[in-house]
Amino acid sequence: MASQGTKRSYEQMETGGERQNATEIRASVGRMVGGIGRFYIQMCTELKLSDYEGRLIQNSITIERMVLSAFDERRNKYLEEHPSAGKDPKKTGGPIYRRRDGKWVRELILYDKEEIRRIWRQANNGEDATAGLTHLMIWHSNLNDATYQRTRALVRTGMDPRMCSLMQGSTLPRRSGAAGAAVKGVGTMVMELIRMIKRGINDRNFWRGENGRRTRIAYERMCNILKGKFQTAAQRAMMDQVRESRNPGNAEIEDLIFLARSALILRGSVAHKSCLPACVYGLAVASGYDFEREGYSLVGIDPFRLLQNSQVFSLIRPNENPAHKSQLVWMACHSAAFEDLRVSSFIRGTRVVPRGQLSTRGVQIASNENMETMDSSTLELRSRYWAIRTKSGGNTNQQRASAGQISVQPTFSVQRNLPFERATIMAAFTGNTEGRTSDMRTEIIRMMESARPEDVSFQGRGVFELSDEKATNPIVPSFDMSNEGSYFFGDNAEEYDN
């Protein structure tokens, strides 16, 4: 847990390491992505994929999902104990797309999980390499964040659909460890906690007995993770109240929803990492790049540089716009689903448009979609500049809250103001300031009211030329201060359904 004891960088969380110096971190992250690359190459050989087919992002996703499923111990155990019709608990598979006679055809493959685990371990020097698995989970999570909206999930837990910018990592599996916890947004943590409290309200044995003790420990741990994301004393104090509650119920749910709303202006610290599809690492390893020797970082220039020299393809449905498909994947690669569009556009060097204006559906193709009309095109994943990823949330100085906009959780450490509609946010805070958290609530509301939309965050931070790998010459962009930059405005995307 980042909030207690030693502070570890999120690369250390990613690689399960204890405190390491920068060189060791770069080497162990390099070892991790190199292992993913080696695994991918081996899988392409097993499946006899051509070079072109191996660069197809849909094939990459199928292969990633197979290895994640092969190592999902909980689910494997569950499947063995509850055999369902037509599902072999020992096998995993998915659609692989091949080019035949100028057409794309779908082939469903099935593999022994044991065999997949063997190939994965072999690619990772015989180890389980959990860090690499988590890395793939975060890439899938970032792709979901860019592709789907979670309105329904928000409404179900009693939250406001406009809080979508707090929902980073909402589709991450529970087994994603410390690295997964670091990238979860405030809203995601709140939602997990509310679900837990609701179960406790409906099932009186939830907190009781041996199981209940474990549940309680999990509850307190999640509270601590969320507390660690808040940056003001009052928000943290409220989290202590929620955590210490004898019998969590509706009062705690109220407090959590209040805290989630407050995070729209007093933003939490949420980590951002550029996690790329397995095929990208595979391409680099195949071309002879030694990740472990060169070192790698998820938050610096490395992912940008990797994407500059990688050609990845995607299947395109008949009425989809390939440029829009590219934008979706670019945002996923850089974990920029909740970033200000002005900043993303500047870094990418082409205009990044809000999702309501994208003519593209998700990257994955459903099994009932017609392959006859499928085409493929190159994804344009290159960028004009690079910038350092942030985990601070961009509050101007730790104690005093800065401005935030409904729907921005900054990804890049780049100077800008964070415009927001104060009236909209503050309207949600009428009424309830009594009860045991009243002084904290009052304090939080006071801080929110003093926040100014024109305050500049990330003072002096800029983007860098791709030739400037040591980040010596920051280029500080100037943005139109009034312009809103939310990706989710006027949204018509599909809901995320498991």
Swiss-Prot record:
Intracellular or extracellular location(s): Virion; Host nucleus
Region of interest called Disordered, as start-end residue ranges on this chain: 1-21
Post-translational modification: Late in virus-infected cells, may be cleaved from a 56-kDa protein to a 53-kDa protein by a cellular caspase. This cleavage might be a marker for the onset of apoptosis in infected cells or have a specific function in virus host interaction.
Keyword Signal belongs to the record: no
Main location group: virion
A GO CC term assigned to this protein in UniProt: ribonucleoprotein complex
The keyword RNA-binding is annotated on this UniProt entry: yes
One biological process term in Gene Ontology: symbiont entry into host cell
Domain of life: Viruses
InterPro entries: Flu_NP
Disulphide bonds in the chain: none
Range of residues in the leader sequence: none
Keywords: Capsid protein, Helical capsid protein, Host nucleus, Host-virus interaction, Ribonucleoprotein, RNA-binding, Viral nucleoprotein, Viral penetration into host nucleus, Virion, Virus entry into host cell
Family: Belongs to the influenza viruses nucleoprotein family.
Subunit and partners: Homomultimerizes to form the nucleocapsid. May bind host exportin-1/XPO1. Binds to viral genomic RNA. Protein-RNA contacts are mediated by a combination of electrostatic interactions between positively charged residues and the phosphate backbone and planar interactions between aromatic side chains and bases.
Name of this protein: Nucleoprotein
Species: Influenza A virus (strain A/Duck/Czechoslovakia/1956 H4N6)
